[in-house]
Each structure stands twice: as structure tokens, then as C-alpha cells.
């Protein structure tokens, strides 16, 4: 195992240059193998989990879902607040910010972005809850792609560019996740569920996030400041893939199916959330349920 870690580290260092010494020794960051292992385990569970649950009753998980989603809401709120205040403290430049001129603000950003990276590991639980509740229609290519790529991308970000221009996407995403996880936490409470109205706007906000992140990243290409351009080009490319996938989800879910869902008497005016309405699965309405995009 140690030999494999050394070979991977040598290969990455030869490709990408020296790592940022400020994160040396941090949990999960010194070696890529733990992150890769978590990813492989995640993909295996995605593949095997639905098979295991095929002939079993769905698990409600309602109480756990409330706690889980509210915990991620609070974590996202903390990360958003810390990033905004740290960026303000360091006088970060919106158009381009290097990784070493922010002083103590850079250290604050690095600390928060480690939590952001770690939160992507926690968010694997989103998929596991879908499997336990037999909401397999929500385990889409978009959902899986978004989850496993974010964890791996942010391992590399944290090792080579853990502050500076890397802050923007994480800040905006943390804000969106405050809205998203609060929605899904509240939607697990039957008495509150009928009053939730902002799910559609979460997807719109995610699309705005990707577009603005791509624009902000492009600014650093046009007006360089020393932030590695290879990272900028990769970020732009990744944002394009997310814009395409999320746009397709939005069109399929809200444009083409919106009219049909309104006419479906089985919903009785209450939208299905995560495959449940009033806390009970209604498997007869699979075709009309909306998938999460996170």
C-alpha cells in the first residue's frame, strides 16, 4: 500500500509540480489512495445497492434524513459565511486572485475549503439514502457524475491550489447547498412539505452558479495574476459539462413534464419529493417524480 501511495504521489508531482506545503499532513490530503478508495466503494455501492434492495421493503429514514440534511445545511452555512468574510478580509480580486498574497485570509480560506472537500465525502450519503428508500430513478448519471467527480477534483485542488481563485465556486455552491439541504430536510417533515415551493429555483440557482463560475474563471485567463492556467482551463471545461447535464435535467423535469404533472390527480396538489409524498412511497407514480440534481 505504501509503495502504491509513493508511486501515485511521484506521478502526480511530476505532472503538476510541487504541492502547497500549507496542507502537508492534513487529513486525507497527503495520499490520493484514500480518496480513490472511497470513490471506488461509492461506485460499487451504487452498482450493488439497488440489487440488494430489489426484493426488500424501502427504508423510511425520515428522522435520519431530517438530521442529515439540517446538519449539511448548517455546515454549508458555516462554509459560506467563512469564505465570504475571509475573502473580504484578504481583499480578494474577483477577476484573478493568486494563492499567496492574501496573508492570513488565505489560511482561513484553506481551512474552510478543506471542510468543503470533506463535505463532498459526506454527501455520498445522498445516494445511499436513495438506495435504502428504493428511489432508484434519482440515481442518474448526472447525480453519480457530480458526486464522485467533486470529491476527486477537490482533492487535487486542496493539494495544489487550496486558496486564491479557487474560492468562488465553493462559496457559491455552499450558498446553493444551504437552500437545497434545508429544502430536503424540511421536505422529510410531512406537515411542512406542502408549503415548500423553491425546489425549481434550486436547479436554476445551480445553473447560474455554473455560468458565473465559468465567467469568473475565464476572467483569470484574460487578466492573469499567477494562478495556474491549467487549473483554469480544467475548471472551465468541467463547468461546461455541468451546464450541459443540469440544463438537460431542468428541461426534462420542469419544461416537458411540468404540464403533465399538474394534471396528474394522483399527486392531489402535493409535489413528490425524493419519491415520497406525506412520508409515504407511491411507487405507482414513478414516471412523474422529480429527481434530485445534487
Swiss-Prot record:
Tissues where this protein is expressed: Expression is highest in intestine, followed by brain and heart, and lowest in gill. Also expressed in liver, spleen and muscle.
Biased composition (Polar residues): 274-286
GO biological process, alphabetically ordered: fatty acid elongation, monounsaturated fatty acid; fatty acid elongation, polyunsaturated fatty acid; fatty acid elongation, saturated fatty acid; long-chain fatty-acyl-CoA biosynthetic process; sphingolipid biosynthetic process; unsaturated fatty acid biosynthetic process; very long-chain fatty acid biosynthetic process
GO molecular function: fatty acid elongase activity
Catalytic activity, EC: 2.3.1.199
CC per GO annotation: dendrite; endoplasmic reticulum membrane
Keywords tagged on the record: Cell projection, Endoplasmic reticulum, Fatty acid biosynthesis, Fatty acid metabolism, Lipid biosynthesis, Lipid metabolism, Membrane, Transferase, Transmembrane, Transmembrane helix
Region (Disordered) location: 261-294
Transmembrane intervals: 26-46, 64-84, 112-132, 141-161, 172-192, 207-227, 231-251
Cellular localisation: Endoplasmic reticulum membrane; Cell projection, Dendrite
Membrane topology: Multi-pass membrane protein
Record's catalysed reaction(s): a very-long-chain acyl-CoA + malonyl-CoA + H(+) = a very-long-chain 3-oxoacyl-CoA + CO2 + CoA; (6Z,9Z,12Z)-octadecatrienoyl-CoA + malonyl-CoA + H(+) = (8Z,11Z,14Z)-3-oxoeicosatrienoyl-CoA + CO2 + CoA; (9Z,12Z,15Z)-octadecatrienoyl-CoA + malonyl-CoA + H(+) = (11Z,14Z,17Z)-3-oxoeicosatrienoyl-CoA + CO2 + CoA; (9Z)-hexadecenoyl-CoA + malonyl-CoA + H(+) = 3-oxo-(11Z)-octadecenoyl-CoA + CO2 + CoA
Superkingdom per UniProt: Eukaryota
Pathway, per record: Lipid metabolism; polyunsaturated fatty acid biosynthesis
One family name in Pfam for this protein: ELO
Assigned protein family: Belongs to the ELO family. ELOVL5 subfamily.
Function: Catalyzes the first and rate-limiting reaction of the four reactions that constitute the long-chain fatty acids elongation cycle. This endoplasmic reticulum-bound enzymatic process allows the addition of 2 carbons to the chain of long- and very long-chain fatty acids (VLCFAs) per cycle. Condensing enzyme that acts specifically toward polyunsaturated acyl-CoA with the higher activity toward C18:3(n-6) acyl-CoA.
Stored HAMAP family: VLCF_elongase_5 (MF_03205)
Name of the featured protein: Very long chain fatty acid elongase 5
Species: Tachysurus fulvidraco
Amino acid at each position: 500500500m505504501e509503495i502504491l501511495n509513493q508511486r501515485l504521489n511521484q506521478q502526480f508531482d511530476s505532472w503538476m509540480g510541487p504541492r502547497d506545503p500549507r496542507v502537508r499532513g492534513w487529513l486525507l490530503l497527503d495520499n490520493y489512495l484514500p480518496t480513490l478508495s472511497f470513490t471506488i466503494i461509492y461506485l460499487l455501492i451504487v452498482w450493488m445497492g439497488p440489487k440488494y434492495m430489489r426484493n426488500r421493503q424501502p427504508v423510511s429514514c425520515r428522522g435520519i434524513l431530517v438530521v442529515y440534511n439540517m446538519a449539511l445545511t448548517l455546515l454549508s452555512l458555516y462554509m459560506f459565511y467563512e469564505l465570504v468574510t475571509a475573502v473580504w478580509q484578504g481583499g480578494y480580486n474577483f477577476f484573478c486572485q493568486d494563492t499567496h498574497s492574501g496573508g492570513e485570509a488565505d489560511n482561513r480560506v484553506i481551512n474552510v475549503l478543506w471542510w468543503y472537500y470533506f463535505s463532498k465525502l459526506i454527501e455520498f450519503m445522498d445516494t445511499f439514502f436513495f438506495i435504502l428508500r428504493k428511489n432508484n430513478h434519482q440515481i442518474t448519471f448526472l447525480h453519480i457524475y457530480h458526486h464522485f467527480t467533486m470529491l476527486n477534483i477537490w482533492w487535487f485542488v486542496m493539494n495544489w491550489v487550496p486558496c486564491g481563485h479557487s474560492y468562488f465556486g465553493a462559496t457559491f455552491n455552499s450558498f446553493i447547498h444551504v437552500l437545497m439541504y434545508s429544502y430536503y430536510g424540511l421536505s422529510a417533515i410531512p406537515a411542512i412539505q406542502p408549503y415548500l415551493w423553491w425546489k425549481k429555483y434550486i436547479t436554476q440557482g445551480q445553473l447560474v452558479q455554473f455560468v458565473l463560475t465559468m465567467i469568473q474563471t475565464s476572467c483569470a485567463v484574460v487578466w492573469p495574476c499567477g494562478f495556474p492556467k491549467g487549473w483554469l482551463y480544467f475548471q472551465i471545461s468541467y463547468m461546461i459539462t455541468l451546464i450541459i447535464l443540469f440544463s438537460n435535467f431542468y428541461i426534462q423535469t420542469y419544461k416537458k413534464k411540468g404540464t403533465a404533472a399538474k394534471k396528474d390527480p394522483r399527486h392531489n396538489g402535493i409535489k413528490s419529493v425524493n419519491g415520497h409524498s406525506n412520508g409515504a412511497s407511491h411507487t405507482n407514480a414513478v414516471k412523474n417524480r422529480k429527481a434530485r440534481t445534487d
